[in-house]
């Protein structure tokens, strides 16, 4: 009989073989599997695989392509939990490698129609007495996920599903809510502290109006007798990275695709790229836009500044640490050029916030030695290190993983807008 880790490894390898163009790396998969096994979270990933497989099998459900750290996980991609083409983006599971206490709770983004049904599907998979949901949480916000599209933070509604294999009532005070349709819901009374995802599993369900709009446009495409692209099908997902549909994102008259209709974002696109050809290009614009806007909000009244200067200029004041836009950029530089291990590189990124300066100093010595061994001058290395650790703000660099899920959805909307303009216009944002 197979052990749990053997089952997980088998599923991961089978999933990897179905991903075209070497979209996941074997080395990264093995590193992640070791991390998962050491953290005793094999059962959690197996449970998540079962649950998402059942969710995506629902005929009218639209599940997001991935959210937060999950989009950087090669294991999640191999299991079919996420649908971001990792081979086209330099995503690495920094949160896994840099911090052994990192929170691995998975977020599932769903359309509005599927939002409540996600709980009932969990009861089918794990059993009614073993599953309970928390009350709705409005205005979900994350300090690490500052999606400053048009100057405001992204706000969403969600709830948590808690799974206890030995019964939820053994661990929490619960009560039943009778539904109008005769389906009862088991709810947890009060707040739920973070779980370890070892003995008690937790999944966050997030309601997405963007996914709802995509689904309604897809319905209109089918009604018109046309072939509708499937956002969650791997073969269809890759066309986003080669389609000129990106250009339709930058339409000042269309405010229904957040952030990308903004004049500042369009200006950045025109400055940086003659033609946007990859998700990497969009992520570059997103990082520059967000950082620039944060700076202006902190230093100026953004509206007064726009009135005075016409537009918010991109490069006149903001300085990124040695040109690094994302945490992933720092990790790739540290490993590829300096010779640090992935775990050391990820830890450097986490220490940039100013915590544990003694540990940072120890890593700096290792960094200097390896950098000079690879041909860098000491003054160059010190300059790069200073740009990371001596910044005026200790706000952490953003992660691609925290932006790419939203960018993917907006790019998919742009593709629908280009290829199916009538159906797109029939569903207003």
Per-region residue spans from a language model:
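Mg2+-dependent phosphoryl-transfer active-site scaffold
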Residues: 1-16, 51-54, 62-66, 70-428
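Helix-rich "cap/lid" substructures immediately adjacent to catalytic or cofactor-binding pockets
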Residues: 20-65
């Amino acid at each position: 009989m197979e052990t749990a880790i053997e089952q997980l490894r088998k599923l991961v390898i089978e999933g990897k073989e179905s991903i075209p163009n070497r979209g996941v790396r074997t080395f990264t998969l093995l590193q992640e599997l070791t991390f998962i096994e050491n953290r005793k979270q094999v059962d959690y990933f197996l449970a998540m695989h079962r649950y998402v497989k059942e969710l995506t099998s629902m005929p009218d459900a639209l599940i997001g392509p991935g959210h937060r750290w999950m989009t950087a996980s090669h294991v999640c991609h191999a299991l079919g939990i996420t649908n971001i083409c990792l081979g086209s983006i330099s995503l690495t599971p920094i949160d896994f490698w840099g911090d052994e206490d990192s929170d691995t709770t998975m977020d599932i983004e769903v359309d509005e129609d599927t939002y409540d049904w996600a709980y009932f599907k969990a009861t089918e998979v794990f059993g009614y007495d073993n599953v309970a949901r928390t009350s709705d949480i409005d205005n979900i916000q994350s300090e690490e996920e500052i999606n400053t599209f048009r100057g405001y933070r992204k706000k969403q509604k969600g709830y948590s599903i808690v799974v206890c294999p030995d019964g939820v009532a053994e661990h929490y005070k619960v009560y039943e809510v009778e539904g109008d349709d005769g389906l009862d819901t088991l709810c947890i009374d009060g707040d739920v502290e973070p779980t370890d995802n070892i003995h008690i599993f937790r999944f966050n369900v997030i309601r997405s109006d963007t996914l709802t709009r995509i689904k309604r446009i897809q319905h209109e495409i089918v009604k018109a007798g046309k072939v509708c692209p499937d956002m969650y099908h791997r073969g269809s997902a890759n066309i986003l990275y080669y389609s000129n549909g990106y250009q339709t994102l930058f339409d000042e008259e269309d405010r229904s695709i957040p952030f990308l209709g903004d004049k500042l974002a369009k200006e950045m696109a025109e400055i940086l790229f003659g033609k946007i050809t990859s998700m990497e290009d969009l992520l570059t614009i997103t990082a520059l836009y967000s950082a620039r806007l944060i700076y202006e909000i902190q230093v100026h009244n953004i509206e007064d500044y726009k009135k005075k200067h016409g537009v918010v200029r991109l490069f006149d004041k903001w300085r990124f640490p040695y040109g690094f836009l994302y945490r992933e950029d720092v990790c790739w530089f540290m490993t590829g050029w300096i010779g640090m291990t992935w775990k050391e590189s990820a830890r450097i990124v986490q220490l940039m916030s100013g915590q544990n300066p003694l540990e940072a100093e120890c890593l700096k010595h290792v960094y200097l030695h390896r950098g000079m061994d690879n041909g860098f001058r000491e003054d160059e290395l010190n300059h790069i290190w200073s740009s990371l650790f001596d910044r005026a703000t200790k706000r952490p660099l953003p992660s691609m993983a925290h932006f790419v899920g939203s960018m993917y959805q907006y790019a998919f909307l742009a593709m629908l807008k280009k290829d199916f303009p009538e159906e797109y216009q029939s569903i207003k944002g």
